From Swiss-Prot:
Superkingdom, natural source: Bacteria
Name by which UniProt lists this protein: Acetylglutamate kinase
SUPFAM superfamilies with a match to the protein in the record: Carbamate kinase-like
GO CC list: cytoplasm
EC number, as in UniProt: 2.7.2.8
Function noted in UniProt: Catalyzes the ATP-dependent phosphorylation of N-acetyl-L-glutamate.
């Protein structure tokens, strides 16, 4: 049980960060186990509502990979991946858009239920996320998979100015009107850049970047961009962590102040990063 004095200490510690980030925009990529566990869902939504109440402007971009795979399985559609990207034919794209739409409204309802004000958006709304067709690394056609070509920040700014928390599903649209499934990390990075966000936070299912993946005590709390190629070469950064780090680097190179990879399995991980001296996870910074 935390004593009253300890509670007071927590509030005092948070005060300078509330002052620092008041009026600033923080983009959060919401995904992984934090989307599957009911208690973690509530913790994340509570964090977002609290941030808004103290003057910070959170913007949420959510994933939905496990839920999409589950729905495809129930419909008898096999999930296929090439270079980590979901092969998305026309029937799969319909399922992707349906599942992401359902998840989007569930997130909005949770935020509203906790006293916040939230609006759900698809990347297709007001051409929020413009996209072109993306091919795999070996130039295979993987269907309706897209890459971001542009973001309409005015829509998000209007929603934010009216006091709402935007929740964005990672679906984009081309100039020809084609709908594309886009990696949520990439969308979050592009939105952070377009909004000139102060922070980009990516929630994952790992503690952050570890020197030794078997030892949680080897967490790298801060990593400079100039060190990332060496860490990839050594195998410290590998697999699914590589594209997340690349999204962080892209955001920093295009004007986002700091980027963070956090363990979404930790309750209130966002608040721990934003409002405490120590923070958690790995912060990726410029050279």
């Amino acid at each position: 049980m935390i004593s009253p004095l300890e509670k007071a200490g927590i509030l005092v510690e948070a005060l300078p960060y509330i002052k620092k980030f008041s009026g600033k925009t923080i983009v959060i990529k919401y995904g992984g186990h934090a989307m599957l566990n009911a208690d973690l869902k509530k913790a994340v939504m509570t964090d977002l509502v609290l941030m808004k109440f103290v003057g910070i402007n959170p913007v949420v971009v959510h994933g939905g990979g496990p839920e999409i795979t589950g729905m495809l399985h129930r419909l008898g559609i096999e999930s296929q991946f090439v270079s980590g990207l979901r092969v998305t034919d026309a029937p799969t794209m319909e399922v992707v858009e349906m599942v992401l739409g359902k998840l989007n409204k569930e997130i909005v309802a949770l935020i509203n239920g906790l006293g916040g004000r939230s609006v759900g958006l698809s990347g297709k709304d007001a051409n929020l996320i413009m996209a072109n067709k993306k091919y795999s690394n070996d130039c295979q056609d993987i269907g309706f998979v897209g890459e971001v070509t542009g973001v309409n920040p005015q829509l998000l700014q209007t929603v934010i100015q009216e006091g709402y928390i935007p929740v964005v599903s990672p679906v984009g649209i081309s100039t020809e009107g084609e709908t594309y499934n886009i990696n949520a990390d990439t969308v979050a990075s592009a939105i952070a850049t377009a909004l000139k966000a102060d922070k980009l936070i990516i929630l994952t299912d790992v503690e952050g970047i570890l020197e030794d993946r078997q030892d949680k005590g080897t967490l790298i709390s801060t990593v400079k961009m100039e060190d990332i190629p060496r860490l990839i070469e050594r195998g410290v950064i590998q697999g699914g962590m590589i594209p997340k780090v690349e999204c962080c680097m892209q955001a920093i190179q295009t004007g986002v102040a700091t980027t963070h990879i956090l363990d979404g399995r930790v309750p209130h991980s966002i608040l721990l990063e934003v409002f405490t001296d120590k923070g958690i996870g790995t912060m990726v910074v410029s050279d």
